[in-house]
Each structure stands twice: as structure tokens, then as C-alpha cells.
Design a protein with these regions (language model features):
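A short, conserved beta-to-alpha structural element at the edge of catalytic cores
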Residues: 166-186
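Short gly/pro/ser/thr-enriched loop/turn and capping motifs at secondary-structure boundaries
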Residues: 71, 178-181, 215, 242-244
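Short acidic (Asp/Glu) and glycine-rich catalytic loops that position anionic groups and cofactors
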Residues: 30, 60-65, 175-176, 197-204, ...
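N-terminal glycine-rich anion-binding loops that anchor highly charged ligand groups
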Residues: 15-31
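Intrinsically disordered, Lys/Arg-rich low-complexity segments
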Residues: 385-449
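Cofactor-binding active-site loop characterized by glycine-rich and histidine/acidic residues
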Residues: 25-28, 35-166, 184-190, 195, ...
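Glycine/aspartate-rich loop-and-adjacent alpha/beta segment that forms the canonical ThDP
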Residues: 226-363
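Conserved thiamine diphosphate
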Residues: 131-138, 190-222, 265-291
């Protein structure tokens, strides 16, 4: 894909990457001065990933950043003072001092979902955001990031499967920064490219140099445009390097020095500066003006953060429970939805006590003559399908369950091809006969075991 960026957009990319770099370097100094009370998870050396991917989005699109995506927050318009005060747990921070790291978002204006500490869980969440936007006809794209370590979680695969099955307008950025805390990616997965995992779900994927902001932007723009056009989800693996430890308390002594040296020579900002100069997009004066602008802005924002007060103690008792922010009429009912699905005769927010899992619980109660208790929720997968599908299809009345037909025993057996009589291709034979695969892996052991 050709580079469609204008000169102004090229300079924008530099501005946001350098703003990201200078902001985080200041926070490192504040951390060492004990002015940052929480953890500090640096994205130094990875600025091209967050900036390049988020810059490919439209204003109406949604993001869910992770701990190393400060650059995406800046591109979305979050002021540096919010990032400073958030990490310093000040009363003026987005969470009013209740969080000392990056757990904050902006749902109403900037369409930012707060990071979730449980790695991988943002994938199904943002898939749901993408599906909701499509349902409402908003033509949005939802995007989130995950690290190489987080790609080993169950939620990663569950979320991708859901996104693929629903053809959601969702983009996943896999940040392969070589290390999950102290575990190298080669000790985590048996494949060379994490993007290969997308094949299992029929998802389109890209592999790009994560330190080349133009390559990152181009891949993200192509993926976002295709998602918006209705072609389903996309996955982009960006190969980069975490140039610090997992957090500021981690000296990263487990990383080979030569590895740091290699990636330091490929610093994303220095590479981009060289690109801008060689292509005559800027000159030394333009660079100096942008750098000076960033320094002035950060001076003001940091001063505001340092002079801001800490939260009052009584604030700890507020915001613990929902106080009218979600219109729920009864403790056991679903929240009242704003819209009813088209073609559905059931009002949004119908009562569930007579359907699905609730009806099953009532049947069990009658059998064991135990008192009934209305459960507050049902499983979002199987029981959710039990509740919604038969009701909607029958116009609001639960359908009778069809009679269960016994399955003949022979249909449960997996057909096997005797070794030597099946396909000539060795890999196919091994896939159909796992025992032979083990034997081939251990030719000296006839039993196929070590």
C-alpha cells in the first residue's frame, strides 16, 4: 500500500512520537523522585506502535489502550496533564487519585475504554464495542492492543473467535516486543510469527516493522479501512522491542546487551527523523520548532500536575457502587436498553424469570423441593442463547424443546486411516494418526515416548 500521508500528517506523527517520548522520560524522573505513587510501565522505544496505529483511526472510532500505549492516548486528544496527574494520584486526575497508573478512559468524548489488568480481556470487550457500533449503524472500528505475553491467554483466543464468527469491525494490534516480563517470546510460543494465529480464525493479518511508523500506519490504515467496509476483523503483529524492564522497578538484567544494542540502533524516532530529512519533508528549523513546542507544553502540564492537591481521605468512600449511572429497575432484571433490536417483538429489558436458566432452576427446585432464589445473571454464552433465541423466534413466548434424538454409537467414532494406507503426504498421515507422529519425533524409541 502506498503512503498517502501529507506533509502535515508526517509532522503530526513526529510530534506525537516525540511528545510520547519526552512525556515518559519526564515521568521516569518523577518516579525516581518518589512523585509517582503507582507503577510506571514504559513504552520508550515503542512509540511508533501506539502513534502509528491510532493515527489511522477516525475520531468516532474506539480504542482500548494497554499499559504501554500512552502515545495512543495523546493521539486521541488526552492532555499530558491527565497522564501526569493520573500516575501521581492527584485529585485533579481522571480518577481523582484513585489509581496510580494508566487505568482510566473517556467513554463520552474521546471513545477510550479504560485498560483492564487481566491481559486479553479487552479483546472480547472491544469486539462487543465493534458489534454495538455496527448494530447502531455508526460505521465505527474498535481497536485494542495486546503484548506477546498476553497473546497466550485464553481470552485472546476466545475474543478472536468471537470477532471472527461475528465479522466484527475490530482490529487487534499484537505488540511483539520480545519479552513478557522476563520470558522471551521464543519460550512462549512454538511459532515464528504471532500473526500466524489469525489463520486459525480466518482473520486477515499483517506483519510489520514496529519501529517504522510509516509501515505501522500503512498497515493499520489498510486494516481499519477493510474493517469499516465490512470485511471482518483484522490482526497486525508489530515487531518491536521493550527498551526498559517490565516496569521501572525491573532492571531487565535478563535481556542480552547485544539485543539492546541492536534495537537501540533502530530507534523509531531517529529512523523517522532520518526519513523526514532524506525525503525533504522538513528541515532543521522545523524540527527545532516542534521540539520547542513540546517542551513548552510539557513544562506547563507537569507544573499543573505537581501543584495539584492529593485527594481528600473521605473520597475513598465515594464511587464504590453505582449511583444512578445505569438505569436498572430491579436487582434481578436486565438493564433497560435504549433500543429494541429490529424485528423483535420483545421489549428491551424483558424479565428473565420464566425463561432459560431461570426456568431450569425452577424445575430443579420443584424436584428437590428447595426454596427458590432468583439468580442475578445468566451465563453470557450458552444460557444467553437459550434465553434469547427461542423467545425472539416465537414472538415472545418460549418454544417447546424439540425431542432429543439418540445418536448412534458409530457416528461418535473418529475415522482413522491405517498408517501406510492413507494419503501419501507425510504431514497429513501424522495429523490423522498422532501415534505415528510421536514415533517420527523419536525414531529411536519404538513406543513413541522419551
Amino acid at each position: 500500500m502506498s503512503n498517502p500521508l501529507t506533509r502535515e500528517q508526517h509532522l503530526d506523527l513526529y510530534y506525537f512520537m516525540q511528545l510520547n517520548r519526552q512525556l515518559e522520560e519526564r515521568m521516569v524522573r518523577l518516579f525516581r523522585q518518589n512523585k509517582i505513587v503507582g507503577g510506571l510501565y514504559s513504552s520508550l522505544g515503542q512509540e511508533a506502535v501506539s502513534v502509528g496505529t491510532c493515527y489511522a483511526l477516525e475520531k468516532k472510532d474506539w480504542i482500548a489502550p494497554m499499559i504501554r500505549n500512552i502515545g495512543a492516548l495523546l493521539v486521541k486528544g488526552v492532555p499530558p496533564r491527565d497522564i501526569f496527574t493520573q500516575h501521581m494520584a492527584k485529585y485533579t486526575s481522571p480518577t481523582q487519585g484513585k489509581d496510580g497508573t494508566s487505568h482510566f478512559g473517556d467513554l463520552k468524548v474521546r471513545h477510550i475504554v479504560s485498560p483492564i489488568s487481566m491481559l486479553g480481556d479487552l479483546i472480547p470487550v472491544m469486539t462487543g464495542v465493534a458489534m454495538a457500533g455496527r448494530y447502531l449503524g455508526q460505521k465505527i472500528v474498535a481497536l485494542t492492543w495486546i503484548g506477546d505475553g498476553g497473546s497466550s491467554t485464553g481470552a485472546f483466543h476466545e475474543g478472536l473467535n468471537l470477532a471472527a464468527q461475528q465479522r466484527a469491525p475490530f482490529v487487534l494490534i499484537v505488540e511483539n516486543n520480545q519479552w513478557a516480563y522476563s520470558t522471551p517470546v521464543s519460550r512462549q510460543v512454538p511459532i515464528k510469527n504471532l500473526a500466524d494465529r489469525a489463520v486459525a480464525y480466518g482473520i486477515r493479518s499483517w506483519i510489520v516493522d514496529g519501529n517504522d511508523v510509516i509501515a505501522v500506519y500503512n498497515a493499520a490504515k489498510e486494516a481499519v479501512d477493510e474493517c469499516r467496509a465490512g470485511r471482518g476483523p483484522a490482526l497486525i503483529e508489530v515487531k518491536t522491542m521493550r527498551m526498559r524492564g517490565h516496569a521501572q522497578h525491573d532492571p531487565a538484567e535478563y535481556v542480552p546487551k547485544k539485543m539492546f544494542e541492536y534495537w537501540k540502533a533502530r530507534d523509531p524516532i531517529e529512523l523517522y527523523e532520518k526519513y523526514l530529512t532524506e525525503n525533504k519533508i522538513w528541515d532543521a528549523k522545523t524540527k527545532a520548532e516542534i521540539d520547542a513546542r513540546i517542551a513548552r507544553e510539557l513544562d506547563v502540564e507537569q507544573k499543573f500536575a505537581e501543584e495539584s492537591p492529593m485527594p481528600p481521605p473521605e473520597l475513598a468512600e465515594e464511587g464504590v457502587y453505582c449511583e444512578g449511572c445505569h438505569p436498572i429497575e430491579a436487582s434481578w432484571q436486565r438493564p433497560k436498553a435504549e433500543v429494541t433490536p429490529p424485528g423483535c417483538s420483545i421489549e428491551a429489558g424483558w424479565e428473565l424469570k420464566d425463561y432459560g436458566a431461570f426456568a431450569e432452576v425452577e424445575a430443579i427446585r420443584k424436584e428437590i423441593t428447595a426454596p427458590a432464589v432468583n439468580a442475578p445473571a445468566v451465563d453470557p454464552g450458552g444460557n444467553g442463547a437459550k434465553v434469547a433465541k427461542p423467545i425472539v423466534k416465537s414472538g415472545g413466548k418460549p418454544q417447546q424443546k424439540p425431542p432429543v434424538r439418540p445418536v448412534e454409537p458409530e457416528t461418535l467414532e473418529v475415522p482413522r486411516v491405517p498408517f501406510g494406507r492413507g494419503p501419501k503426504d507425510k504431514s497429513v498421515r501424522e495429523a490423522q494418526n498422532p501415534r505415528d507422529r510421536h514415533a517420527n519425533q523419536n525414531p529411536r524409541d519404538k513406543r513413541g515416548r522419551r
